[in-house]
Amino acid sequence: MARNVPEWLAPTTLKGALELRARYGDEATVVAGGTFIGILMSQKIIMPQVLLTLRHIRELAFIEDQSDRPLRIGAMTTHRAVERSALIQQNWPILTYTFSLVASPRVRNQATVGGVLADADYASDPPAMLCALNARTVARSLDSEREIPIEELITDYYETSLRPNELLVEVRIPRSVKQAVYRKFRSRSSEDRPCVAVAAAWVGGKLRVVVGAVAERPQYFPDICSLANGQQLSRELATEIGRRYAEAINPISDSRGSAEYRRRVIAVEVRRALEEVVGHE
């Protein structure tokens, strides 16, 4: 029996990719690094007829850090490039740390910043940290561009708010970030995905706590975080915020842990993350 081989579209410019995106819409599955979609295809979870690969578009692989502007990371920048960037290491060490925890060097050399967000894979490391940093994604079509906060980009398991004619082209992180911390709780091997991920940061004088890998999207509750605004972040307050997060989240059960197990871990890891965040605005 002949294999069903999908048609490959391989533009070399962003304009060319957007033209193809406009023409094919949802009929074409977009491929960035290919780490996630490769698994889905090998397990026959999805069988796309058309693949639109972005790997040849060099203009989407960049890191730009200017003192008076947000940090900009192109969608086709690999996890490894973020991890090894001297600019990131000097000015955004929390990103160096977070991306270094993703799987293995082999995976990080292939997986991209845009891909991990557009895939909306709930068990990935970067989305929670980027959300805590108040990062914005940039979605572009042939005739428009818009910024989408991470918490609005990911809408459900493996689903985003990107339109059929749009591509995610970059991530922007505001310079108002002060202290930030990322905690990855693994229930299995050191290279495993998180059972519970907690990111916390002071951004523009306000606390942002985001819990990942426990539900369909990064879990962020501004009303709970507001308890810390203008307050000394004591152990008692950190414990209370952790307790409220555990109550507010409806965790999933999977091979990394049951819902009840995750709920207990959430309370502890949120408290620990807050105890690591030094200072307040």
Give the role of each language-model region.
Residues 1-281:
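C-terminal structural segment of proteins
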